[in-house]
Amino acid sequence: MLHWLLMLAMLAGVIGCAGKAQALDSSEVAFEGQNYRVVHLDLKHEQLGLYWRDPQGGQAFGSIESLRQWGEAHSRRLLFAANAGIYDHKFAPLGLYVEKGKTVVPLNLAHGNPAAGNFSLLPNGVFAIYPDGHAAVRTSAAFKADGKQARLATQSGPMLLIDGKLNPQFVDDSSSLKWRSGVCAKTPTDVIFAVSEGPVNFHTFGRLFRDKLGCRDALYLDGSISQLYVDGEGYSGAPALMVKPYAGIFAVFSKP
């Protein structure tokens, strides 16, 4: 009898550990009067992918919900999702977009294009994950100079932090307040996504990554359309009525 009790206890422990392995590090963080949803991804255990179009039909996913349903149809549960970088009026990436090692849209080094909005607030940058599983946030110029092919990458802007310093174009008391999302690679395998639960300016959002989250290089992803999704918690960020189609979605699915 004791033998069977021990076996059941061990089995329960294994099941419990398996369940915990699927749980993401998600928390609500308060910073200077505003709340943020912050998700840490350990790339040693969580496979972060980037998705724009259905690989079968070529139709753009457009929304996190569409991607979630696609995952279900393939017996994969969506654990985490976030919009990728800035895109143009045709809902195509405005800058570099790399998916599964293929460069779909090349690096954009154009300067001073007013139609590009925040993307033209320089320097802009790239968030990339390389074939060795390591992630990095670099300015667009630094990414080009590296010349390394990424497994996945999105280009957006502006850079929030460059080598531990705030983007010099940010103004402390700016009245440009919006929902904002961003990403940093705190270490090569510790990726942090954050979205504000209310409108904030760039200066405050950059300081969140520097002073609260401990990042040295961080990239702004997008503004008032930005949301994060975490399985079991739902959506955080901009109100649903403000969300528009995305041209690229970061996602972590359950393992088959």
Give, region by region, the residue ranges found by the protein language model:
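Structural motif
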Residues: 78-80, 125-126, 134-136, 158-159, ...
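Conserved, well-ordered active-site substructure
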Residues: 94-110, 169-217, 226-256
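Bacterial N-terminal signal peptides
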Residues: 5-16
